[in-house]
Amino acid sequence: MKLIKSLILLAAIAVSVPSFGQGLKAFKLKNGLSVYIWEDNTKSDVFGLVGVRTGAVNDPAEYTGLAHYLEHVMFKGTDKIGTLDWTTEEPIYQQIIAKYDEMADEADPVKKEAIGKEINELTIQAGKVSVSNEFSNLMESMGGKNLNAATGMDLTYYHNSFPAFQINKWLEISSQRFLNPVFRTFQSELETVYEEYNRGQDNPWRVQYDFIQSKAYEGHPYSRSVLGLPEHLKNPRLSQLIKFYNDWYTAEN
């Protein structure tokens, strides 16, 4: 079956766990994908989780926050989910990628601002031929609940619950999500991530935690904040985000 052969995700398909480890089934597909199943026939809903063994520790030193930012844009669809006309949208998407590289390389603030305006115009054009929330809508339409994700130092995971009879549809949508993602609304999502960073700076627990990490693991990637440094968040490269995805979001990982 094409779906199973090409599935690039680590799926923990569980309903609930009566006793930790009881009834656990684990196996590995030919492409290296590890699959874990816990079964509880007393429940009607399934809890599906896709985990990737990567996080802030794998962020490039000059582009911190990538793992977390990637988590955000993994909800924006694929070349089939979320597009009204991919033939029209794709060249605009490629222009946006190139413009972010151009803006990151530009030192002149005035020229940088001008490139930002070009990106804004291209984003508006792309928005006319895309529906960035279609992935989330599809999950909800099949009875999916609590669609969410989280990024840690070594792990990023995506999860939601759904009716058991929808498992084939969930697998199909999830596999497409991880095989052919399109990182739409990069511009507006960056603002969301930066606002999350600002809220963290107002949170004493977050500030203390980041301080302890920076001292306890000084000189090591564990010293970084998952959210990244503000100077990196303000000067993003979509091409680096795509590279991070290609490097780490693989079946065996």
Residue ranges and their predicted role:
Residues G23-K25, N31-L33, S44-V50, Y63, ...:
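Envelope-exposed proteins and targeting segments
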Residues G32, N41-I92:
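Active/ligand-binding-proximal structured segments within catalytic/core domains
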Residues S19-G21:
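Boundary at the C-terminal end of the N-terminal hydrophobic targeting segment
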Residues K28, W86-N253:
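Charge-rich, well-structured scaffold segments of protease-associated domains
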Residues M1-I8:
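Bacterial N-terminal signal peptides that target proteins for export
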